[in-house]
């Protein structure tokens, strides 16, 4: 296990999460403006699809947060174990 590679993966996951949050904010703004003037069955179907997409996106963000936390914990565990092992042999 290379702690540097693990730390890099955790950083990339966090960056992806921030990027997704920016995209979601932009999408929500566009959808809100769209539905000011759009009505009818198509608008209702779109609103339902948007709610479904938003629920899936929220699940993805939650899973990403859990994965990031697990990666951070694993990094701390590995680097701690490495430091202990090095200390025993120094």
UniProtKB/Swiss-Prot annotation:
Keywords assigned by UniProt, alphabetized: Secreted
Domain of life: Bacteria
Inducing or repressing factors: Transcriptionally regulated by the sigma factor SigM.
GO cellular component, one term: extracellular region
Keyword Chaperone carried by entry: no
Annotated localization: Secreted
Family recorded in the similarity comment: Belongs to the WXG100 family. ESAT-6 subfamily.
Name of this chain's protein: ESAT-6-like protein EsxE
Species this chain originates from: Mycobacterium tuberculosis (strain CDC 1551 / Oshkosh)
